[in-house]
C-alpha cells in the first residue's frame, strides 16, 4: 500500500487585488493560481511573485486555505 504523499495542492491569491479599488482593475475579481508544494521542505505559507491579469502587473501572491 502506498504512503500518503508529501506534495499538496495549494491556492495562491493576489494580495493587491483585495485592497485595490475597482477603478484600477481591468476586470472585477481576484487573481488566483494553483500550484503544488512539498509539505516537508516548505512548512510555512508559500509567497510568490506572479502576474496579476486584473491589475496588469507583477504582484505578490500568498497561499490561502
Curated annotation (Swiss-Prot):
Keyword Transferase: no
Disordered as annotated region, ranges: 20-42
Disulfide cysteine pairs (residue numbers): none
Pfam family, one: Ribosomal_L33
Superkingdom classification of source: Bacteria
GO BP terms, alphabetized: translation
A GO cellular component entry from the record: ribosome
GO molecular function, one term: structural constituent of ribosome
Keyword Ribonucleoprotein: yes
Record's keyword terms, sorted: Ribonucleoprotein, Ribosomal protein
Protein family: Belongs to the bacterial ribosomal protein bL33 family.
Name of the protein described by the UniProt record: Large ribosomal subunit protein bL33
Organism: Prochlorococcus marinus (strain SARG / CCMP1375 / SS120)
Amino acid at each position: 500500500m502506498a504512503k500518503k504523499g508529501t506534495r499538496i495542492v495549494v491556492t495562491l491569491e493576489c494580495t493587491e487585488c483585495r485592497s485595490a479599488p475597482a477603478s484600477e482593475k481591468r476586470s472585477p475579481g481576484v487573481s488566483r493560481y494553483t500550484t503544488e508544494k512539498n509539505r516537508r521542505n516548505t512548512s510555512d505559507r508559500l509567497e510568490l511573485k506572479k502576474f496579476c491579469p486584473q491589475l496588469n502587473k507583477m504582484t505578490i501572491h500568498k497561499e490561502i486555505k
